[in-house]
Amino acid sequence: MNIELTDTPKDQDEAFVIAQVQKYSSRFIVRDQRSLCVFARDGNGIMIGGLTGRTNWQFLEVLFLWVHEQHRKTGLASKLMAMAESEAIKRGCKNARLDTFSFQALGFYQKLGYQEVGHLPGFGGQHTRHFLHKSLCTGA
């Protein structure tokens, strides 16, 4: 047996491990992962905001949300989130999840109805990572 520790793994080695986990998991749940992105551009076609995420297992997972500093506090981030949530519901999602750091937008997400389900302190020695959930079911 040979055990290797590396910070420069071969792409095929990483892909193999991921594929094996997915193969095992597929016995229990159908994998239906699809990208879901929303982009906002100004009149010149310059990106001023964007959301990247995916839907899978009836969940919307928001990975990144960004709005250019000049366009913050204008409601743009809320529009991006609403569009993503609406599309996720059309795809059959019942829940949404995301995480954010203490120096990012915890209060913003809470105003949108996200509830903290956990947190981990100590990132970079001083920051906390917050994990949030929101039900996308009507009336919930």
Where are these regions (language model features)?
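Short coil/turn segments at alpha/beta junctions that flank glycine-rich nucleotide-binding fingerprints
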Residues: 31, 74, 91-94
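Conserved acetyl-CoA-binding loop-helix of GNAT-fold acetyltransferases
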Residues: 73-86, 111
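Conserved GNAT acetyl-CoA-binding A-motif
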Residues: 88-101
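Conserved catalytic-core motifs of GNAT/GCN5-like acyltransferases
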Residues: 97-99, 115-131
